């Protein structure tokens, strides 16, 4: 296993244990080594989101969409980060995209209704 993979796993384990702050440290190191890995960007975005670092979470989810434009979760997560910053109209657009990419997902549909 590579050092990057070990850092990624360490970050995911910290997230699973509710230690998002610790996760950011490992995941930032992993990202510096492999910035084009969508899985690292997603995990780091989640860690930033859980530590209420909304602009950083937004940046990671945008980067994730650059790498995987049809990723429904990336659109949903970006919408959540945008919503936390009061950017409801832009957030709603990403919720709609997420919902169109994964029709029938209750979480995605509920966010659209909430921002209606």
Say what each PLM segment does.
Residues 4, 38-39, 72-73, 106-107:
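Helix-start (N-cap) detector for alpha-helical repeat units in TPR-like alpha-solenoids
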Residues 16-29, 51-63, 85-97:
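Structural signature of tandem alpha-helical TPR/SEL1-like repeats
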Residues 1-6, 29:
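TPR-adjacent "capping" and linker segments in tetratricopeptide-repeat scaffold/adaptor proteins
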Residues 83-107, 113-116:
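TPR/TPR-like (Sel1-like) alpha-helical repeat modules
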């Amino acid at each position: 296993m590579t050092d990057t993979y070990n850092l990624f796993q360490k970050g995911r384990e910290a997230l699973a244990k509710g230690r998002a702050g610790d996760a950011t440290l490992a995941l930032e190191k992993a990202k510096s080594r492999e910035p084009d890995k969508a899985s690292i960007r997603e995990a780091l975005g989640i860690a930033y989101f859980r530590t209420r670092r909304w602009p950083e979470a937004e940046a990671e989810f945008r980067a994730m969409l650059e790498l995987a434009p049809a990723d429904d979760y990336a659109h949903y997560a970006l919408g959540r980060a945008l919503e936390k910053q009061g950017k409801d109209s832009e957030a709603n657009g990403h919720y709609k995209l997420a919902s169109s990419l994964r029709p029938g997902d209750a979480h995605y549909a509920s966010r659209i209704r909430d921002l209606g």
